[in-house]
Amino acid sequence: MTFWNEIYAHFDPVAFSIFGLKVHWYGLMYVLALLVALYMAKFFVKKDRLKFSNQVLENYFIWVEIGVILGARFGYILIYSNAQIFYLTHPWEIFNPFYNGKFVGISGMSYHGAVIGFIIATILFCRKKRQNLWSLLDLCALSIPLGYFFGRIGNFLNQELFGRITDVSWGILVNGELRHPSQLYEACLEGITIFLILYFYRKYKKFDGELICVYVILYAIFRFLTEFLREADVQIGYFSFGLSLGQILSVFMLILGFSAYIKLLKNSQTEQKFNQNKS
């Protein structure tokens, strides 16, 4: 066994403590992910001369953060948790970071739920602030991937969302068994790779909303593939054809992404023809 294989034995998921409260690396990575996403948004606004002010972006990120947290938490409870009745009768426990008097943080977040919360928050923000919805979503498509990268690194450091059992040399020892570091696969594919693709693809953007559609399509494909190397949630298991819930949700995302792309493309072509005839 190499140091890498046994890295969890040498690594503490708790970064430090403040007045008895344990601060986990996952929490730090989550904050870093938000800061990186905001920085990237400002970077592309300046680089591509987009019509969004810093004040608009900062206000928007507050709205989005609230939407993402609510969506991620409620999404986990509704989709992945087997304690829906408990939370329905004890709603104050949904965001309770304490257990038996000890601070343990809020565990259980769903990315697909976060996406729903993100979309709702974005729609409400654009309606209230009179912003271009699809243009803002395109900016998010460029900003999210690198933030997502740090989020998955946080999952790895927090020793959660393990991969399936493997015999590859780079496997991570978890409870006596080597497992795929699937969190790192996702960080690279759904984070770095998608960012690089969109970074260069944006130069060929033909209509507002195109980048967010491409992001959704790419994420769905990569998530579907990496799920084959990721252990399914114990309380849910696998469905028909050995597919996980994450893969099933990714199929819906893929359909949604392609459908939105086709609709927006047709709308763009119709608008171009109308403008040509008008001139």
Curated annotation (Swiss-Prot):
GO BP term, example: lipoprotein biosynthetic process
Keywords recorded for this protein, A-Z: Cell inner membrane, Cell membrane, Membrane, Transferase, Transmembrane, Transmembrane helix
Gene Ontology CC annotations of this record: plasma membrane
Annotated membrane topology: Multi-pass membrane protein
A family per Pfam: LGT
Subcellular location per the Swiss-Prot or TrEMBL entry: Cell inner membrane
Pathway: Protein modification; lipoprotein biosynthesis (diacylglyceryl transfer)
UniProt binding sites for a 1,2-diacyl-sn-glycero-3-phospho-(1'-sn-glycerol): 152
UniProt enzyme class: transferase
Gene Ontology molecular function terms on file: phosphatidylglycerol-prolipoprotein diacylglyceryl transferase activity
Listed transmembrane segments: 25-45, 60-80, 103-123, 133-153, 181-201, 209-229, 236-256
Bridged cysteine pairs (disulfide): none
Documented EC number(s): 2.5.1.145
Family: Belongs to the Lgt family.
Function: Catalyzes the transfer of the diacylglyceryl group from phosphatidylglycerol to the sulfhydryl group of the N-terminal cysteine of a prolipoprotein, the first step in the formation of mature lipoproteins.
PANTHER family: PHOSPHATIDYLGLYCEROL--PROLIPOPROTEIN DIACYLGLYCERYL TRANSFERASE (PTHR30589:SF0), PROLIPOPROTEIN DIACYLGLYCERYL TRANSFERASE (PTHR30589)
Name under which the protein is recorded: Phosphatidylglycerol--prolipoprotein diacylglyceryl transferase
Source organism per UniProt: Campylobacter hominis (strain ATCC BAA-381 / DSM 21671 / CCUG 45161 / LMG 19568 / NCTC 13146 / CH001A)
